[in-house]
Structure formats: structure tokens, C-alpha cells
Design a protein with these regions (language model features):
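C-terminal long alpha-helix characteristic of the crotonase
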Residues: 136-141, 192-240, 244-253, 269-273
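Terminal low-complexity tails and localization/encapsulation signals of metabolic enzymes
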Residues: 1-6, 260-273
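CoA-thioester-processing core
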Residues: 102-110, 116, 122-176, 189, ...
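Conserved CoA-thioester-binding segment of acyl-CoA-metabolizing enzymes
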Residues: 1-60
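Glycine- (often His-adjacent) and acidic-residue-rich active-site loop
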Residues: 59-102, 121
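Structural motif
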Residues: 31, 116-117
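Acidic, divalent-metal-coordinating active-site segment for phosphoryl/phosphodiester hydrolysis
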Residues: 178-185
């Protein structure tokens, strides 16, 4: 399926990697209503496609994502209109709801999701990276919680994910000052798994995605689910969930393949069954 503002490509040894590119380079991939809608469609379709083992999200051109596009339409009401001159606040609320539904669809993906951050990454773009499971960034990347600079807190869940990744103090600094964080500082804080030169970004991201693609899909999905669902649980309750997941994978074909490949001293070929 073709889109106006999103490029999709299947890559990998089994074509199990869904490579998603935000494609508004002239706007630094700012998220318009159309881009939000098309991303949501991509994520929803990926969730029901068993052949997808990993999703990669990146940006075309020199930026990853400059946040939501507030240059026109109902989104403009959120930033530029005064209380007296606002004419389409209902449209602005609809825009925010569409944004939220797109990120809910992203979080619902049960396969690992990797952000490949090639440049500027602010506002809703940073939220997107925070909602991914892993991230690879180039040294050209810069990160910012931009909402506070506009007197807003129209955050798309970054307040939820960011403190869990980089820690409370760093997240609070970003959310209350709006200062840019460079690639090196962001990597040191734990926002990214790998930091490479711009020329190495795609290759390093592909290396990580291929490692994910080669893994056991059932075990990966259950592991991701447990990591998220058990946050806030007590230890014993979390172990109960883990026991259920262990029992499920123990009865799978992939478990048998893992055992055979170990005995035969070869790399396993997992099928997700």
C-alpha cells in the first residue's frame, strides 16, 4: 500500500523487518494530520501481520521529526490562536485525539520497535522515540521537549515514557526547561542504545534489526509484554506472569528448534510457532 507522507519497505533475511520512513523532509518530517493518520494505519496493519518481526522508524532527509506540524489547520489553534480569536478548538481537540491514537497504535505493537534517529528530534518526535523499545542515533541528532517553549503541555505520552528511560531528574529538566539535549548527552542518559556517525546509522540500525528478526517471535513478544505489563507489580505477582509465559514458550515449536540447534551446534531458525 502506498502513502502520501510515509514510505514503507520490507527488509531482512525473511523480509521480517518493516522499515518505516517519515517522508516530509522539506518540513523536517513534522507530523501533519495526514502523517499521523498514515502512521496509525501502518502500525495497525503491522500489528496484525504475523510476518512482521521488527519495526524500524526513521526520517527522510536531515531530520528525524520536528514534532507536530502547527503551521496551519486546526492544529494551529493549539499554539497561535488567542482565546478570543480561536475559531476551531473542536478541530484542535480532534487533531490531538488523532495524535494520541497514533501513539497508542505504536505502543500496541507487540514486536520490538527501533527508532533510527538521523537528526533533529523534538516534541512529538521525541515522544515517538521514547515510545520505541530501542533507539540508534547519529551524532547529528538533537532532542528537545518543545511544548514548554510554547506554553503548552500537549505531550503525547513523553511524560510517561521519558522518565522511565533517562531517569526522573534528566526528564524533569527537559520537560521544564525545553533545552536541547545533544546526541552524546542523550546517549549517556540512556535514551539511545547506540550512537554512531551519520554514515554508519543505517548499517548499525539494520544490524540491530537483523538480530531481532533472527530471534524467536513468540518469546520476544511475551518478553516485551511482560516488561511493560509488570511495571508497578510486586515481584511475586510478576513471577506468576513469567511462569505463564514460560509455559507457553516451552510448548512451542521454536522451543524445540532452540533445543535442536543447540545440540547440532548451529544457528536456530525460528518460525514464531
Amino acid at each position: 500500500m502506498s502513502y502520501e507522507t510515509v514510505l514503507t519497505e520490507r527488509r531482512g533475511e525473511t523480509s521480517g523487518i518493516l522499515w518505516v520512513t517519515l517522508n516530509r523532509p522539506e518540513k523536517l518530517n513534522a507530523l501533519s494530520m495526514t502523517l499521523f493518520d498514515e502512521l496509525r494505519q501502518v502500525f495497525q496493519q503491522a500489528r496484525t501481520d504475523r510476518s512482521v518481526r521488527c519495526v524500524v522508524i526513521t526520517g527522510a532527509g536531515r531530520g528525524f521529526c520536528a514534532g507536530a506540524d502547527f503551521s496551519g489547520g486546526p492544529a494551529k489553534e493549539l499554539v497561535y490562536a488567542s482565546q478570543e480569536s480561536a475559531t476551531d478548538l473542536e478541530g484542535a481537540r480532534l487533531f490531538f485525539r488523532n495524535e494520541s491514537e497514533t501513539y497508542i497504535a505504536l505502543k500496541r505493537l507487540d514486536v520490538p520497535v527501533i527508532a533510527s534517529v538521523n537528526g533533529v528530534c523534538v516534541g512529538a518526535g521525541l515522544d515517538m522515540v521514547a515510545h520505541c523499545d530501542m533507539a540508534v542515533a547519529s551524532t547529528a541528532a538533537r532532542f528537545q521537549v518543545a511544548y514548554v517553549k510554547r506554553g503548552l503541555f500537549a505531550d503525547l505520552g513523553g511524560f510517561y515514557s521519558l522518565p522511565r528511560i533517562i531517569g526522573w531528574r534528566k526528564a524533569m529538566e527537559m520537560m521544564t526547561t525545553g533545552r536541547f539535549m545533544g546526541a552524546e548527552e542523550a546517549h549517556a542518559a540512556g535514551l539511545t542504545n547506540y550512537l554512531v556517525s551519520p554514515d554508519e546509522l543505517e548499517a548499525k540500525t539494520m544490524e540491530l534489526a537483523l538480530a531481532v528478526e533472527a530471534g524467536p517471535p513468540l518469546g520476544q513478544k511475551l518478553g516485551k509484554m511482560l516488561a511493560y505489563r509488570t511495571q508497578g507489580m510486586d515481584f511475586e505477582s510478576a513471577l506468576e506472569f513469567s511462569g505463564i509465559a514460560l509455559g507457553t514458550t516451552a510448548m512451542s515449536e521454536d522451543r524445540n528448534e532452540g533445543r535442536r540447534s543447540f545440540a547440532e551446534k548451529r544457528e536456530p531458525k525460528f518460525t514464531g510457532r
